[in-house]
Amino acid sequence: MARMMGPRFKQSRRLGLNVCGHPKANKRMGKGLGRNDKKLTEYGMQLLEKQRLRAYYGVNEKQMHKYFEKALNNKEGLTTGDVMVRQLETRLDNLVLRASFASSIRQARQMVSHGLIRVNGKKVDIPSFQVAEGSVIELKEKSRSNELFKENYETNFAQSLPYIDKEENFKVTLTRLPERQEIPIEITDSLIVELYSR
């Protein structure tokens, strides 16, 4: 399992984004260690964007570099950055978060690792599992009465994305692969590509 070390609120302030899913983190992001406290060099900007993307998806450096290498060799006619972000977006743990089963990427990863998630009717307990277009993701039936999961799902049910179809019984479908502009992350991925291309 990928581990993002350090206090989550502090990391949110340093990176300028909510990496823990806690509403209080949004209030603290602008205090103390914000992104703009000092002028960054070009390398510093590239490094910060990479750290932010890693934090969004909760992946470690080794995983991140693998996604870059796969994207670099893509034959789809898309930019390396677009393919890299799309691969991250369609990880199972991230789609569990997008489905509103979980309130943070950490919680989503735990749910997958503990065997609570089904993909096309089969248990998948690998957070990095790459979900294919048309796949159905659902919460294990015995876990659907869990109050925390119910609150997550009911509170955020209306928040959807054009490539995800939600149903009311803890079931979602990845209807198609996402376009880069549809993925709701504030990242300049070209800076990350430049960093890894050095």
Curated annotation (Swiss-Prot):
It comes from the Bacteria. GO terms for molecular function: rRNA binding; structural constituent of ribosome. Keywords: Ribonucleoprotein, Ribosomal protein, RNA-binding, rRNA-binding. SUPFAM superfamilies: Alpha-L RNA-binding motif. GO terms for cellular component: small ribosomal subunit. GO terms for biological process: ribosomal small subunit biogenesis; translation. Residues 90-152 form the S4 RNA-binding domain. PROSITE patterns: RIBOSOMAL_S4, S4. InterPro entries: Ribosomal_uS4, Ribosomal_uS4_bac-type, Ribosomal_uS4_CS, Ribosomal_uS4_N, S4_RNA-bd, S4_RNA-bd_sf. Part of the 30S ribosomal subunit. Contacts protein S5. The interaction surface between S4 and S5 is involved in control of translational fidelity. HAMAP family: Ribosomal_uS4_B. PANTHER family: 30S 40S RIBOSOMAL PROTEIN, SMALL RIBOSOMAL SUBUNIT PROTEIN US4M. One of the primary rRNA binding proteins, it binds directly to 16S rRNA where it nucleates assembly of the body of the 30S subunit. Belongs to the universal ribosomal protein uS4 family. This is Small ribosomal subunit protein uS4.
